[in-house]
Amino acid sequence: ILVEWNQKMNLTGIEDEKEVFIKHFLDSISAVSKGYIKNGMSLIDVGTGAGFPGMPLRISLPDLKVTLLDSLNKRINFLQEVANQIDIDDIEFIHGRAEDFGKDENYRECFDIATARAVAGLPALMEFCVPFVKVGGHFVCLKGPNANLELEESKKAMEVLGIEYIEKIDIKLPEIDLDHNILVFKKVKN
């Protein structure tokens, strides 16, 4: 579906089906491997774009309550069409900006998990995502080869936002030599 729609509108720079599967789907569900994201939890995917990692996480965990947030309506329309085609009717789709919805009492501190992938540098990403997370919940972000540097640059943001660094998980994807990481943080205060 993604490859087909990508011909009409730019959703991803990756167009080969096998690459889409490995770099988008497998990369997205790798966040499940350590048990931070489980069935029964509530998750918001901030800046979801073409639905990564939120949509693959919902497909692989059918009882995960997922909210997909993106500032571009064309992406939200695409994701609604995908959900219809694969018969998933319990995802919430939000067209809007994280900065606005993170202040909304209907969304602020309402989620067990906030995720993001390829949205912004880590300090800004924390400011976008952490307001959605309940105290005791986690911010789980997928980052590339500069994860350690971004982590160093985020110490002040972590302190201000009330989160603690838990771990960096190195991700190895089949047939592709990419340096991908998952950074996990726990919200300890609001």
Enumerate the predicted regions with their spans.
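Short small-residue beta-strand/loop micro-motif enriched in glycine and branched aliphatics
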Residues: 11, 63-66
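S-adenosylmethionine
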Residues: 65-67, 71-190
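Predominant activation on well-ordered alpha-helical scaffold segments within soluble catalytic domains
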Residues: 29-32, 58, 186
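Conserved glycine-centered beta->alpha loop in an early N-terminal alpha/beta scaffold
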Residues: 47
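Class I SAM-dependent transferase core
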Residues: 1-40, 44, 74-91
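A general structural signal for well-ordered alpha-helical segments in protein cores
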Residues: 2, 25-28, 54, 151-154, ...
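Short conserved AdoMet
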Residues: 38, 62, 134
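Conserved SAM-binding loop of SAM-dependent methyltransferases across substrates and taxa
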Residues: 50-63, 127-130
